[in-house]
Swiss-Prot record:
It comes from the Archaea. GO terms for biological process: translation. The keyword Transmembrane does not apply. Part of the 50S ribosomal subunit. PANTHER family: 60S RIBOSOMAL PROTEIN L26 FAMILY MEMBER. SUPFAM superfamilies: Translation proteins SH3-like domain. Belongs to the universal ribosomal protein uL24 family. One of its GO terms (molecular function) is structural constituent of ribosome. This is Large ribosomal subunit protein uL24. Keywords: Ribonucleoprotein, Ribosomal protein, RNA-binding, rRNA-binding.
Length: 122
């Protein structure tokens, strides 16, 4: 079984390459977002990984202030799609606008998964 070697380089090109070539179980760690003040106090942690079904508030960008449920999470792109956050293509079709999870705040957690509940509570 191969081990994941920790990143030791300071070079930006190697930092970027490590992110782009990371396996999916490592990319999951890049999908963290801040918890709202109430959730942070309740669970005793400041952040959690975003999953489908969470309710998030967008904190940065064109859709700042928009709140909606997470439709999908793309580990390959490192983005999430949120209800009500859409772009219109030239032909008129609407597509979900990809959002970086670092630009959102989780306001309500989807707790159907028991393992998630135990991993968030500390």
């Amino acid at each position: 079984m191969s081990e994941v070697i920790e990143m030791v380089s300071k070079q930006p090109r190697k930092q970027r390459k490590a992110r782009y070539t990371a396996p999916l179980h490592i990319r999951q760690k890049f999908m963290g977002a801040r918890l709202s003040e109430a959730l942070a106090k309740q669970y005793g942690t400041r952040s959690a990984a975003v999953i489908t079904g969470d309710t998030v508030k967008i904190m940065r960008g064109d859709f700042k202030g928009t709140e909606g449920k997470v439709q999908s999470v793309s580990l390959m792109d490192g983005t999430i799609a949120v209800d009500g956050v859409i772009s219109t293509k030239v032909d008129g079709t609407e597509v979900p606008r990809p959002i970086n999870p670092s630009n959102v705040m989780i306001t309500k957690l989807e707790m159907k998964d028991g393992r998630r509940a135990s991993s968030i509570k500390k």
